[in-house]
């Protein structure tokens, strides 16, 4: 019996000892894990400190511009500080890229060309490129079938199939002017073209180009066209072109003269790029009668496309496009709504849908009925009477 008790005690002691050692092992594992994390953090801190020390000890480099190559090994470079040097080139740098006007990095001590830099881009031009035109299909533009066809022939066809023009022996249009009353879809058309073509899109608000310093506005125009040439295919869309494209006159303030200099630079750039090149220009305005004749001549803006107020059929198409995403209940008589909306443009028709939705929300409904649309069109018809159409000359371009 005593042997059995001894065996039980030894077993209990062994189990207790095992548990203690297991707990001790887990504790050691936890300590090792913590130590590894601390080591990892210390290594990270060490590497960061080492990088900081290197950056403090490193010598800056000079930015220069290649004027012209002398031979296979040496080039004439103008440093940013002003003086000119004859310098060599690092073996890893591609010498074919070092053409006149290329920005380069020069070593502080030896003035050797270390690497080539991309062209300097004005932040204003850079921001133009990064404006998203949105995902707009041609089917979202209602009532403008002929205008879409003409615009695609002028802009999309030369970019996608330039060989068609070469085969026929004609020169494609360089640029297109979209003109018409406000709210008829000029900007929407340009955005639809941009989202359906795999090309860079520069959206320019003409009034934003004007700068108070003499020559800055013209420099922006030059940089914009240079950037477009380097990033072909590219579409430049200049909205509200009447801000800089108005008729020139002899008298005026210094601000007027700056606008005229900007226009002359724009005309010069329009003459400068190749017609078969992959840079196309779209301009939009609702004041075509004030534009300078030099801007409108063929060879600069070859096609003038009028975007008129929609007729009854076009209004029906536009209204159905805007109403397609609205939760509706019952039959909607679009024909009656369109008849009441005589003289409405595309923006007004979109506003009808918004106002109809507001009437539904006011009635605590989550759907729109026909009566909401009728109330909305009557309300907007009253507001429409306050608008004036005197700013748009409907006779422009008609003989």
Curated annotation (Swiss-Prot):
It is found in: Cytoplasm; Nucleus. GO terms for molecular function: ATP binding; ATP hydrolysis activity. ATP binds at residues 180-187. There is a cross-link at residue 203 (Glycyl lysine isopeptide (Lys-Gly) (interchain with G-Cter in ubiquitin)). Keywords: ATP-binding, Cytoplasm, Isopeptide bond, Nucleotide-binding, Nucleus, Proteasome, Ubl conjugation. Its main location: cytoplasm. GO terms for cellular component: cytoplasm; nucleolus; nucleus; plant-type cell wall; plasmodesma; proteasome complex. Belongs to the AAA ATPase family. This is 26S proteasome regulatory subunit S10B homolog B. It comes from Arabidopsis thaliana (Mouse-ear cress).
